[in-house]
Amino acid sequence: MGMAYMRLNPEEESYDPLRAIILLERAANGGDAEAQYELGKLYEKGIGIAQDTKKALTLYRQAADANYADAINDLGFLHYQGGLGIIQDQKLAINYFGQAADLRHPEAMFNYAALIDDGIVAGKNPKDAAKYLYDALRSGAAEVLNQLLKNPKMFKQATRLELQRQLVKVSLYDGAIDGQIGPGTQKGLKRAYGLKE
């Protein structure tokens, strides 16, 4: 995979998308889920090869069947938004997001938390949403930290309260449980992410 990635970086002297495709096809045909996913992206975008969205979807599904979280998360988006000719299917999209989140995919954990917060994931509550947000922070997802610091009210107060409780539970916050993402909670979020102040 490393050789293929090197050949896909246009800033490297070794940039050669055609060679990368050969390497990825070999690995994908051998059952490598990451290669299936990466090759699918090339087919989807038409990089180094003729664009073929059906082939891209086939490769994404193969990678997802092997529990490759990036592919599962992307299939969630495609079903949620109706991309690449897929008919929108919110229920299936939520299942994909949940599966990818349970595999600890940071973006999926954030997305799934947002869907839970919106009340559209049956059987889940604000405590579940907060746990997925916390886990996304712990995975080192900078975008999750940035969203929570810059736009905390994108999540309802009940989820913010539970997130504060989660931070207290793991000794990263000792302030008020009020649902406000003030300086103390921000410090706790940064500590959950791995920053030390």
Annotate each language-model stretch with its function.
Residues 25-29, 61-65, 99-102, 135-138, ...:
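Conserved structural position within tetratricopeptide repeats
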Residues 12-23, 50-59, 86-96, 123-132, ...:
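Structural signature of tandem alpha-helical TPR/SEL1-like repeats
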Residues 1, 8-11, 29-32, 45-47, ...:
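Short helix-capping/linker turns of helical repeat alpha-solenoids
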Residues 2-9, 38-45, 49, 59, ...:
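Hydrophobic face of amphipathic alpha-helices that form TPR/SEL1-like repeat modules
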Residues 35, 71, 86, 108, ...:
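TPR alpha-solenoid repeat register
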Residues 157-158, 168-197:
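Short acidic, glycine/serine/threonine-rich helix-capping segments at coil-helix boundaries
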Residues 95-98, 102, 110, 114-117, ...:
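TPR/TPR-like (Sel1-like) alpha-helical repeat modules
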Residues 85, 121, 152-166:
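Alpha-helical linker/edge segments of TPR/alpha-solenoid repeat scaffolds
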